[in-house]
Amino acid sequence: MIKAIDKESINNICSGQVIFDLSIAVKELIENSIDAGATTVEIRLKEYGEEFIEVIDNGSGVEPSNFVALTMKHCTSKLESFSDLLSIETYGFRGEALSSLCSLSNCIITTRTKNQVTAQRLVFDKEGKIQTQTPVAREVGTTVQLSNLFKGLPVRYQEFKRNIKKEYAKLLTILQAYALISTNTRITCYNQAGKSPRSCVLSTTSGSTIRDNLINVFGTKMSQSLDEFTASDSLFKVNGLISKIGIGSGTGQSISNSSSSSSQSSSQLSSSSSSSSSSQSSQLSIGSLSRSCADRQFFFVNSRPFEHSKLAKEINSLYQSFHKRGSYPVVIFNIEMPTNNYDVNVTPDKRTIFIQKEQQLLLLITDGLKTMWETAQSVFDTNQLGQFTFNDENENDNSNNNKQSKISSFPNLYTLKTEEDENNNKITTPIKKHSTTTTTSSLNSPSSNKKSSNSTSSSSSSNNKNNRNNLEEDGDDSFDITDQQPLKRAKYDGNYNNSNKKPELPKTPYPNKKKNNENEDEDEDEDNYVQPVFSNVNKSKNSSNSGSSNSLDDIIDDNEFISRSNGNSSNFMDDFEFKGSSNNIGSSSNGIKLKTISNNNNSNNSNNSNKIIDDINKTIDKMKQQQQPQQKMGLNDDGDDEEQQKQKQQQQQQKRKQQQQQQQIEEEEEETIDGYKQKNSKTFDITIKTDLNTISKQYLIRNGTFDKDNNPIIPNTALVVSNDDMVVNNNNSNEFDQNSIITTTSEKCCIVDKSIPQLDGKFSTSLGGIGAKQQQKAATQVTSQLQQQPSQTNQKTAEEELTKFFKKEYFKQMIVIGQFNLGFIIAKLGNDLFIIDQHAADEKYNFEILSKSVESSINSQPLLKPDTLSDLTSEEELIIIENVDLFKKNGFKFIIDHDAPTRFKIKLSAFPIIHGQSFGIKDIYEWIFMIKESSIPGSVNKIPRLNSLLASKACRKSIMVGTTLTHKEMKDVLNNLSTLDNPWCCPHGRPTMRHLVDLSIKDKLKQQQQQQQQKQQQQQQQ
C-alpha cells in the first residue's frame, strides 16, 4: 500500500540530500551572507566544525516580517517562478539551505537591520519554527550558529566525526574559492581545537582583484608565478590567472602579440608591454609553479564556483604538452556569460552547471592558452650585467678545478669584463691545447729577485684605445679583461727559458707589509714560493729548445685553467686612477721586463717583443710627466681639511691591517690541486693576450664575416709580464692615471690587471681616492640605483626593462661568439647575450623535420589474415567506426562488418610502420581511450606513441654534448631555429635558449659614474 511519508521523515530525507557534509553547510551560509551584501564575513569553528559553527557578517540583515518564513522549506525572496532561473544572479534561490540546517543541527540566528534599534536572537526547532526570540545587542548584520551537525543521523554523524579532518580540509578548499572570487569582501576563518586559543586559518583583506585575494590566500610566491589570462568572443568572456609554463625565460611569462614590437628594429629585441595576459608579477623572476595534482584549480561562472571536469582536463592536457607530464597548473578562471546560457539547477550543491555551446567555450580557452604559451616561450627575462656574478675564489679549489667550464670553439675567446663588475668577482680564463697563449712568470733577471721594501708590483693595460673605440662604434663590446687576484700556482722551483734547461720557476719573495708603522715594509720569508700556472708542469721537463708549439703542448693541458678573483677594490675600465699613500710607488726600476714564448722563429718574436717593450717604456715616461698632485675624481674628498684626510687614512690603514691579517691566515692553509701542494700566494702575474691582428680577426668571426675553417687563427706570441719585473718609477708622486699606461702599439694588445691586492697595501686609495670598502659601496650604490629604476616608473616601463620579446626571425641575425663547454653556443644580438643548447636546438629541428615527413613515411603493412579485435566494447567499436578515416590516415586499416555481433564487428587488416617502428593493437586501444577522453572532436589526430618515437629518433641523430662545432655549424644551428614552428624547447621539454646578460648596463653605469663625479667636483668647488 502506498502511503504518504510523515513530515519529519521528509524533512530528514530531503535535508540530508541538500546538506551532505561540513563544507556544504558552511558554503550555504557564506552564500547567504554575500547575497545580503556583506563586505565582511567571519567563520568560526570549534573542533574543526564538529562541535560548533558560526558565520558572522555585516550584511543587510533580516526584516522582522520575514522571521517566520526564514527557515521554511522553499521560501525565498530571490525568485518567484521557474522562469526566473534564466536571470538568477544570486548564489541561493531554492530556499532549502536554512530549513535543512535546522533539521540537521541546533540552529540559532541573530540578526538586525539598519532600521532596528536592537538585534533579535532567534532559536529554531527541527522543523524550522521559532522557539524563542529575545532582543540582544548587535551591529547591523546576521550571525548563524550551528551545533551538533548531523547528530540526528547516527550513521552519518559517526562518519562525520571519524573523517572530521578530511571534512575540514574540504571546507578550506571551498573557502579558498569564495575568498578568491569575492572581491571587496573580507573573508576570515578561525578554528579552535581543544583548549588552545583560536587560530586564523584563512584571511583576505577585501582585495579589489583576484590577484590581491590570491596573495592573501596563497602568498606572494604563487601570485608571482601566475599569468593573467583573458579570452572573449561574442558569447563568453574569460578572465583569470594560470601558471606560467616556465619555458624560454624560466618564467614563461606572457606578453602581447608580436605586433606590438613590429615598429622596432628587427636587429634588436622587442620589449614586452601590456597584453591580454600582462603579468604584473613579471618584475620578479619566479619560475613556473606546477603541481603534482590538480588541487588548486578554481572555475567560476559569473563568480559562482563550479566544477567542470572537461575544462580541467583540456587545460591540464595542454599544459602538460608545454611543460611536462604529471604536472598540473594553478588555475583561477571566471567565465562571464549571459545567465540564460547555463543551468545551475542541476545538483543540490549547485556545483555542477550545464553550459550551452560548451565546445565553443572549450575552444576559446584552449586556443587562447595555446597562443599565450607559445608566445610566452619567446619571452626572456633580461639579466643585467651588474647582477652577473662569479664564484668566490675562497671556495674549494679542488671542486672548482673539477667543475671548471671552458669556451672552446675558437683558439682565443676573450673573457668579458666590464666596468660594473663588483668585488670578489671571479674570471676563469681557459688555456687551450695547441694554443700558445699562456701565462707564466718571467723571473730570470737577477735584479728582479729582490726589490726594495717600498716597491710594489703594479699592472699596466696596453689595449689599443683607438681600435677599441672602433669596435664599440660597430656595436661590439671591448675585449678588456680585468684580472683581480694573483694567479693560483703550484709550488715549483726553477727557471723557464727557451733553452735546453728544464723549465723552472725560482723562489721569489714579495713585500709583506706590516701595518704597525705606515712606512715600514719587510720582505716575506723565503718559503713563500711563486707557483707555476699550469698544474702538471712536470710535463714541461721534456720540452725542447726550439721553442715550438710542442713545448707548450707538453705543458698545457686541455682542462687547465687560471683563476683570478677580485682583490679588495672594484674597478672600472675608464677614468681609473690609483692614489698612493705616503709610501712612494717604487724606488728604482729599469722599467718593465717581458718574456715571450713563441711558436714561430725567435727572431720575429724578439722584434715584436722589443716593440712592445719600447712602447711600454715610452708610456711610463709619459706617465711620469702627467703626475698631478690632486685627486681627479675625489669621490671621498669631503673638503680641504688635512686633519680629516689623515683620520680617513688612519681608518683605511686599520682596515687594510685587518684584511692583511686575514690574508696571512689564509696563506697558512695549504691546498692540493692536481697533486701539488699550494698556498694562496700573494705574487701577482699579468696575462698578456694575443696581437691586434688576431683580435681583429676574432671580431670579424664574432660578427659573422670571418670563416674560421678557411683562415684559422693561431696566435703568434704569448707575452708575459712578471710582477717583480714590472716596477713603476714614481718617486716624486703618489698618484698616476691608468689611462697613461695604455700602450699605443699597433702590433700587440696587452691586457693586464688593473687592481692588485698588493697595490692596495701600498696605495691608501684607488678609483680617485676612495678606499676598498668605500669603493665597493659606491659601486654597489650605482648598481642598486640602476636596479631600482624600474620600481620608480610605472608598471609598463618596469616590464619593458625586465622582459625581452624574441622573434624567431632574430635567430638569423644573431652573431655567433663561440662554443661553451662543448655543449652550448654563445650568441649575441644587439646588446643581449644568449646561450643556446646545441643538443636541444638541433633535436627540435630534427623533430619537426621528422614530424612533417610522417605522412610520407607511413607504410601500411597488410596482414595475411585479418585480426579480429574481440576485446573491444560496443562503445570502442563505435569510436573506431566514427573515426575510421583518421585511423586510415595514420596507417591502420579495418574491415568492418556492421551485421556482426558486438565484439566481432571490426577486424584489423593492416598496421602502420613509421620510421622503422611498427604500431599494433595496443596503440589502437590507447588511441581509442584518448579519443574518448578528449572533449574536443578531432583534437587527438595522431597515434599517441608517435611523438615519443619521433622525439627519441630526433635525439639520437642530433648534435651531442661534447661535440666541437665550427663557426659555420653553430650558425647553421641558429638558422635552423628560425625555420621552426616552435623553436623554444626540445620535444623532451628542455629549453633551447636562455638570456644571459644585457650589456647595455655598462653605459648606464658609466653615465652614473660620470654624474657622481660631476657632483663631487661641484661640492669641491663650493
UniProtKB/Swiss-Prot annotation:
Residues 436-469, 647-664 have a biased composition (Low complexity). GO terms for molecular function: ATP binding; ATP hydrolysis activity; ATP-dependent DNA damage sensor activity; DNA binding; mismatched DNA binding. GO terms for biological process: mismatch repair. It comes from the Eukaryota. SMART domains: DNA_mis_repair, MutL_C. Disulfide bonds: none annotated. This is Mismatch repair endonuclease pms1. GO terms for cellular component: MutLalpha complex. The gene is pms1. Heterodimer of pms1 and mlh1 (MutL alpha). Forms a ternary complex with MutS alpha (msh2-msh6) or MutS beta (msh2-msh3). Belongs to the DNA mismatch repair MutL/HexB family. Residues 403-412 have a biased composition (Polar residues). Component of the post-replicative DNA mismatch repair system (MMR). Heterodimerizes with mlh1 to form MutL alpha. DNA repair is initiated by MutS alpha (msh2-msh6) or MutS beta (msh2-msh3) binding to a dsDNA mismatch, then MutL alpha is recruited to the heteroduplex. Assembly of the MutL-MutS-heteroduplex ternary complex in presence of rfc and pcna is sufficient to activate endonuclease activity of pms1. It introduces single-strand breaks near the mismatch and thus generates new entry points for the exonuclease exo1 to degrade the strand containing the mismatch. Residues 251-282, 390-527, 622-676 are annotated as: Disordered. Keywords: Cell cycle, DNA damage, DNA repair, Nucleus. It is found in: Nucleus. It comes from Dictyostelium discoideum (Social amoeba). It holds the Pfam family MutL_C. CDD domains: HATPase_MutL-MLH-PMS-like.
